[in-house]
Design a protein with these regions (language model features):
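Active-site beta3 strand of CheY-like receiver
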Residues: 48-64
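Receiver (REC) domain active-site loop signature in two-component systems and cognate sites
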Residues: 69
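His-Asp phosphorelay/catalytic-motif detector in bacterial-type signaling
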Residues: 2, 27-28, 58-62, 89-95
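Alpha4 helix (beta4-alpha4-beta5 surface) of REC/receiver domains from two-component response regulators
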Residues: 20, 76, 87, 91-97, ...
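A Lys-centered signature of the CheY-like receiver
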Residues: 122-123
Length: 136
């Protein structure tokens, strides 16, 4: 079981379904949601408040990331998150897995260029596939 998961997806229904699947399967108890990459960066950057509120659940151990979102898409998030990982030790922990409806091979290749991206899954979420990726 992962300590916590951050789901970055602009679709409220997808967020709800992913959260439900993660918690009901016993994968995690705590799921954080962000509607886009910008919102997620703000959340991840606020260490003091989040650590005080969520204790051992912050920072999340896993980030599930969509590609197509407003304000800051998944690839823009990765660029900013890469810098955040270098600046803040606690951000070096989370594993990123893309969870998207995109079947574009160029997107897969682009995502896997980041060393902290460990997988690329297609919606809907397959918990067994996610467990395989996270366990490696």
């Amino acid at each position: 079981m992962k300590s916590s998961v951050l789901v970055i997806d602009d679709n409220d229904i997808d967020q709800y379904l992913i959260k439900r699947q993660l918690t009901e399967s016993g994968f995690t108890k705590q799921v954080f949601n962000s509607a886009n990459g910008e919102e997620a960066i703000v959340f991840l950057s606020d260490y003091d408040n989040n650590k005080a509120e969520y204790k051992n659940e912050f920072p999340p151990g896993l980030i599930l990331l969509d590609i197509n979102m407003p304000l800051m898409d998944g690839f823009e998030f990765l660029k900013v998150f890469k810098k955040l990982r270098q600046e803040r030790d606690y951000c070096a922990t989370p594993v990123v897995v893309f969870l998207t409806s995109s079947n574009n091979q160029a997107d897969v290749d682009k995502a896997m260029d980041f060393d902290f991206v460990k997988g690329y899954l297609h919606k809907p979420l397959d918990i067994d596939q996610l467990k395989k990726i996270v366990s490696n």
